[in-house]
């Protein structure tokens, strides 16, 4: 995803936004995977276009541009790194089931602010497929509040009783079983016809 500041191009009254995509597929220099304009063998038909939501958003002078969240289970710490459009005070508030468990503030310097918050011992709730617990976080700037969420979980590779390396989630062996689904939607290729179609 990417964004563009179009402030300088806006005019009073009605404006029109035109979004276009040009893709040379295997005739261009960009990465393309196994797509070719002339498919065959292991190569799939070329596809390009707008396949995710495009929108206009009015933002204040100081707004969140990017947020990175990194959990560390052994230390009960979660690190937040935020990029903002201009230097300002940034507040980080973590809640678990509506209860505040961590809060910190930092001033962005060169459009960057970061904090490491340690969760109280009684607030550590690790994520798993059987217990998909999520924490909520509010990132507050002078004129904007952004909400997101994260999970506390740790992936490791540890030997089992026979010395065979196993993937472990939060210290417990877990079987990873994936599916390679290279099917495309008939009408939209990458874009499904509806949210319901993705579930079935």
Q: Where do the protein language model's features map onto the residues?
A:
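Short, solvent-exposed loop/linker segments at the N-terminal edge
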Residues: 70-76
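Short acidic/polar inter-strand loop motif in beta-rich domains
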Residues: 22-29, 142-145, 171
């Amino acid at each position: 995803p990417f964004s563009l500041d179009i402030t300088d191009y806006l005019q009073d009254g009605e404006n029109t936004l035109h979004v276009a995509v040009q893709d040379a597929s295997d005739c261009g220099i960009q990465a393309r995977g196994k797509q070719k304009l002339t498919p065959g063998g292991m190569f799939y038909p070329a596809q390009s276009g707008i396949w995710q939501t495009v929108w206009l958003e009015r933002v204040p002078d100081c707004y969140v541009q990017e947020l990175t969240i990194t959990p560390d289970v052994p230390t009960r710490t979660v690190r937040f790194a935020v990029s903002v459009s201009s230097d300002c005070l940034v507040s980080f508030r973590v809640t678990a089931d509506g209860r505040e468990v961590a809060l910190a503030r930092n001033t962005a310097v060169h459009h960057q602010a970061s904090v490491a918050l340690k969760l109280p011992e009684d607030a550590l709730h690790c994520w798993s497929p059987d217990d998909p617990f999520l924490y909520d976080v509010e990132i507050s700037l002078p004129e904007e509040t952004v909400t997101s969420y994260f999970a506390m979980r740790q992936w490791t590779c540890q030997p089992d009783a026979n010395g065979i390396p196993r993937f472990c989630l939060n210290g417990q062996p877990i079987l990873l079983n994936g599916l390679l689904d290279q099917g495309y939607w008939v009408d939209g290729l990458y874009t499904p016809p509806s949210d319901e179609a993705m579930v079935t």
